[in-house]
Swiss-Prot record:
Required cofactor(s): Mg(2+)
The gene coding this protein: prpB
Protein's recorded name: 2-methylisocitrate lyase
Function: Involved in the catabolism of short chain fatty acids (SCFA) via the 2-methylcitrate cycle I (propionate degradation route). Catalyzes the thermodynamically favored C-C bond cleavage of (2R,3S)-2-methylisocitrate to yield pyruvate and succinate via an alpha-carboxy-carbanion intermediate.
InterPro entries tied to this protein: ICL/PEPM (IPR039556), Isocitrate_lyase_ph_CS (IPR018523), PrpB (IPR012695), Pyrv/PenolPyrv_kinase-like_dom (IPR015813), Pyrv_kinase-like_dom_sf (IPR040442)
Family note: Belongs to the isocitrate lyase/PEP mutase superfamily. Methylisocitrate lyase family.
Alphabetized PROSITE patterns for the sequence: ISOCITRATE_LYASE (PS00161)
Domain of life of the source: Archaea
Pfam families hit by this protein: PEP_mutase (PF13714)
Subunit and interaction comment: Homotetramer; dimer of dimers.
Disulfide bond residue pairs: none
Residues holding Mg(2+): D90, D92
């Protein structure tokens, strides 16, 4: 059904909390626009991840915290008004200090976020799998978490620590344990380097855990089943759809450049029928016809009353 005629998801934070409690593990693919979000929902995914890296990438910018809170809230609302599954939103460092994080949480929850992720890097932040990251103090991150928890209505607060690549595994565990005490609902250990590290982290941090299965990074390729067995409740694939879209576009553009036609790669394209079905195109036509019919009936009654 066309999203304009669907009721929005009510209290998405509670929906996500219940989903985490009911499922062994929740798989949340990364999305960066409403069409991809709608496709992911159509395919059966029960939660989505709005990736900061994918958003900035779609704007041809690096993942350095360059977008604004207003832009992120806009992207969030575009996606949450289309789908009826909870969306986890990557808010990078929270757009400032603790008092700024309060507004960030309120704005993103108002935009429909089910969970809001904040990390412990300094600004400008970096992709979690690059060298040269720097961290704020544990105390400053605790302040942000306390502020976030105090500002939210239902949204879950995801605390990401990038300490593994800066201070080492033990410090990552220590920070995570502190963040749980501060009230974080979910802990996200970024850039762990082996399945055994993920297992050890889960043994020592008593909270729902989120694993990042990105590509071309420091984390080896680990399956959803392996993460489940290691004790993780959520696994995200944050930039996979964005990377796939770029590669597919490159293939199509090269075909047009070299052959001057796309006819030999039609099997690689989403058809008109498939796209119309995805967005509920015919629902719009039906609605337009219904409005026209009602208008005609009203005008007919009006004309009859005048002539009668």
């Amino acid at each position: 059904m066309a999203f304009l005629y669907r009721e929005p998801l009510e209290r998405p934070g509670l929906v996500l909390r219940e989903l985490i409690e009911k499922r062994d593990i929740v798989v949340a693919p990364g999305v960066y626009n409403p069409a991809v979000a709608l496709l992911a929902e159509r395919m059966g995914f029960e939660a989505l991840y709005l990736s900061g890296a994918a958003i900035t990438g779609s704007l041809a910018m690096p993942d350095l915290g360059l977008i604004t809170l207003s832009e992120l809230a806009m992207f969030t609302s575009y996606i949450t008004r289309v789908v009826r599954v909870p969306v986890i939103v990557d808010a990078d460092t929270g757009f400032g200090e603790a008092i700024n994080v309060e507004r960030t949480v309120r704005e993103l929850e108002r935009a429909g976020a089910a969970a809001i992720q904040i990390e412990d890097q300094v600004m400008p932040k970096k992709c979690g799998h690059l060298q040269g990251k720097a961290l704020i103090s544990p105390e400053d991150m605790v302040k942000k978490i306390i502020a976030a928890v105090g500002a939210r209505r239902d949204a879950l607060i995801v605390a990401r620590t990038d300490a593994r690549g800066v201070e080492g595994f033990e410090k990552a565990v220590e920070r995570a344990q502190l963040y749980v005490e501060a009230g974080a609902d979910i802990i996200f250990p970024e850039a762990l380097t082996s399945l055994e590290e993920f297992r050890e982290f889960a043994r020592r941090v008593k909270a729902p855990l989120l694993a990042n299965m990105t590509e071309f990074g420091k984390t080896p390729y680990i399956t959803v089943d392996q993460f489940r067995e290691a004790g993780y409740k959520i696994v995200i694939f944050p930039v996979t759809t964005f990377r796939a879209s770029l590669k597919a576009s490159e293939t199509v553009l090269r075909e047009i450049m070299e052959k001057g036609t796309q006819k030999d790669i039609l099997d690689k394209l989403y058809t008109r029928t498939e796209f119309y079905d995805l967005i509920g195109y015919h629902d719009y036509e039906k609605r337009d016809a219904e409005v026209s019919r009602k208008a005609e009936e009203l005008l007919a009654r009006h004309n009859n009353s005048r002539t009668g």
